[in-house]
Every structure is written in structure tokens, then in C-alpha cells.
Amino acid sequence: MKKIDVKILDPRVGKEFPLPTYATSGSAGLDLRACLDDAVELAPGDTTLVPTGLAIHIADPSLAAMMLPRSGLGHKHGIVLGNLVGLIDSDYQGQLMISVWNRGQDSFTIQPGERIAQIIFVPVVQAEFNLVEDFDATDRGEGGFGHSGRQ
């Protein structure tokens, strides 16, 4: 298992609010909690930035982190990330902030310590562009959206 440096920015993390952990041995994501003093009500269509009380420094350029919505909140309540996916670069060292968007029809209240997003760590390949005049031909060519059909 890869070690990632984590700094606790709020003294409640690790005490009142548990540190992120994998729920099962097969879990890909670690749940992130809302490090709030008071509940926040999010009206339909509204967004807000929610602190996690944690900062990370991945330090390895072959890794990045992605913050993703929790499936139950998205499906049942319309609570997703305002930027859809949060990308955390390996050299970032600041607090993890979660952009929360209520795309649902009803107001939603975020409680202090509530699990509102998840973070996963993914491999990264930094590419260098090779400028060309033309590409070698493929069967697909420039076929884009919907090109391969639905069935």
C-alpha cells in the first residue's frame, strides 16, 4: 500500500470526525467528511465549498488523487461535486475542499462530520506531444460521439 502524507488541519479530525479509511478490503475510495462547525443547508441548484480539515501531499508525480461524489448522495438526493471530479495534483499541499452541488429538487442539509465525497488515488502518465501532419489510418478514423452505436 502506498503511503501518502496527510496533515490534520482541524483538531476534531481523528477524534470527533474519523480519519478516512477504506470500508472494505476491496474499496477503491476513502470517504471524506464535512469538517463543519454547523450544519449547512444547500438549496436546489446551489453550490458550496466544504472543508475536510485535511491537507495531503502526494509527492509522487506518477500519482494523483480524484475526489468523486458518493453514489448514494448523488442518486438519492442529487448531491454531487460542483466540478464533477476534483483532480488533486501530486505537488498540491493545501486543504482538501469539496465543491458540493445540489442538483436535486429539494434542499439538502450537510451535517458536521457527514461523509460527502470520496477520494481515490490513480496512476498518472505525463505525456509529451509528438507533432505530426497526419495520423496513421484506423478503422474508426474521426468517428466520434455515438459512432460505435448502441447495441
Swiss-Prot record:
Its EC number is 3.6.1.23. InterPro entries: dUTPase (IPR008181), dUTPase-like (IPR029054), dUTPase-like_sf (IPR036157), dUTPase_trimeric (IPR033704). Keywords: Hydrolase, Magnesium, Metal-binding, Nucleotide metabolism. It comes from the Bacteria. Pathway: Pyrimidine metabolism; dUMP biosynthesis; dUMP from dCTP (dUTP route): step 2/2. It is an enzyme of class 3 (hydrolase). Substrate binds at R70, S71, G72, N83, L87, I88, D89, M97. GO terms for biological process: dUMP biosynthetic process; dUTP catabolic process. It catalyses: dUTP + H2O = dUMP + diphosphate + H(+). Its cofactor is Mg(2+). Homotrimer. This enzyme is involved in nucleotide metabolism: it produces dUMP, the immediate precursor of thymidine nucleotides and it decreases the intracellular concentration of dUTP so that uracil cannot be incorporated into DNA. NCBIfam families: dut (TIGR00576), PRK00601.1 (NF001862). PANTHER family: DEOXYURIDINE 5'-TRIPHOSPHATE NUCLEOTIDOHYDROLASE. Belongs to the dUTPase family. HAMAP family: dUTPase_bact (MF_00116). This is Deoxyuridine 5'-triphosphate nucleotidohydrolase. It comes from Escherichia coli O7:K1 (strain IAI39 / ExPEC).
